[in-house]
């Protein structure tokens, strides 16, 4: 895909997230690898619903600005994940309602914030690790995500939001949407007796994904 096509897709996805209520104001950011040495990321303070192709930030892997506006302050953790995991091609970070609500709950399992109860959660991301709370923009977030970048596709930032990776922007977006729907179901089912997937069922789904 050309640089221009990647930029147009990012603008399109940002608007789609915004119009469907996955993000508000200037919250959240998106990024995608353009090649081995360059990353496209949303600019600082930008609304995902009002992105423009011309203003999207192009960075090298060291964070130097090659084109467009100044990048989001959270571009640091995007770059850290790309450096650690070559298979990570795109990243979506949102403060979507249900995943952010989930991130504010105490005593979540740090290895998997939601015990699997649908096959789609397992097939899409496998699990969602919980990152301890740090202020937005803290270098500790980049450190934590870098340390885990090879161990999963989805990470819940405590009291903050979600970070989701994919093989491209569309895949990362699809993964994020599946997670938000799973979190919505989690809250909808509160007070009900949930039938969780068994370890055998989870393992079967994981094996089918290999």
Curated annotation (Swiss-Prot):
E.C. number(s) listed in UniProt: 4.1.1.104
Keywords noted in UniProt: Carbohydrate metabolism, Lyase, Metal-binding, Zinc
Cofactor: Zn(2+)
Binding site for Zn(2+): 74, 93, 95, 160
Active site: 74, 120
Catalytic activity: 3-dehydro-4-O-phospho-D-erythronate + H(+) = dihydroxyacetone phosphate + CO2; 3-dehydro-4-O-phospho-L-erythronate + H(+) = dihydroxyacetone phosphate + CO2
Record NCBIfam families: OxoTetrPhDc (NF043034), PRK08130.1 (NF006000)
PANTHER family for this protein: 3-OXO-TETRONATE 4-PHOSPHATE DECARBOXYLASE-RELATED (PTHR22789:SF0), FUCULOSE PHOSPHATE ALDOLASE (PTHR22789)
Protein name as it appears in the record: 3-oxo-tetronate 4-phosphate decarboxylase
Organism from which the protein derives: Haemophilus influenzae (strain ATCC 51907 / DSM 11121 / KW20 / Rd)
